[in-house]
């Protein structure tokens, strides 16, 4: 990311920090190095180290949910905000989360066996990515695309 355009609006602040509390107990702390760049990769603004290397993993999920929203698939689901939330993030496989992922499939009359995420204890719905996968399938159904190859598109 190096260029003479670098650091135009760079912050000297440390990385952003998110803390997760479970009741009154601190469960985890996450340091966030954030970068805004132009289409040529020039750093326009950052918090923390703009050169920090990381693996994108689940932080990509909100972007992967864009077709779910832009196709209109999400808006056809009753109380869509919860479905959008489970499509945009990882979850712990709780009943609340698995029900929401299932609701996406139910609303689009999609069999659970189409889910390609690994089957965990009892069901692929318990996988932390099941909401994202359910949203992919709902989008395919909305756009009349094949469900069995949704990961290949």
Identify the function of each model-found stretch.
Residues 1-51:
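Beta-lactamase-like hydrolase cores
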Residues 11, 80-153:
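Active-site-adjacent helix/loop patches that line small-molecule binding or acyl-intermediate pockets
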Residues 32, 62-67, 99-103:
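N-terminal, well-ordered alpha-helical segments
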Residues 35, 66-68, 139:
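Proline/glycine-anchored alpha-helix kink/cap motifs
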Residues 42-44, 74, 144-146:
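Short helix-loop capping/hinge motifs at secondary-structure junctions, enriched
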Residues 47-53, 85-88:
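Short helix/strand-bridging catalytic loops that position acidic/His residues to coordinate divalent metals
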Residues 56-74:
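Active-site SXXK
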Residues 73-81:
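Phosphate-handling active-site elements
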């Amino acid at each position: 990311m190096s260029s003479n355009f670098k650091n135009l609006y760079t912050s000297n602040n440390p990385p952003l920090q998110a803390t997760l509390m479970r009741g009154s107990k601190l469960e985890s702390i996450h340091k966030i190095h954030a970068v805004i760049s132009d289409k040529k990769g020039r750093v326009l603004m950052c918090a923390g180290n703009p050169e920090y290397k990381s693996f994108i993993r689940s932080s990509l999920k909100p972007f992967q949910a864009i077709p779910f929203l832009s196709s209109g698939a999400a808006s056809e689901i009753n109380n869509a905000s919860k479905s959008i939330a489970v499509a945009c993030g990882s979850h712990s496989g709780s009943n609340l989360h698995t029900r929401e992922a299932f609701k996406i499939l139910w609303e689009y009359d999609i069999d659970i066996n189409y889910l390609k995420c690994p089957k965990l204890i009892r069901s692929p719905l318990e996988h932390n990515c099941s909401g994202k996968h359910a949203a992919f399938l709902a989008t395919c159904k909305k756009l009349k695309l094949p469900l069995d190859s949704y990961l290949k598109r």
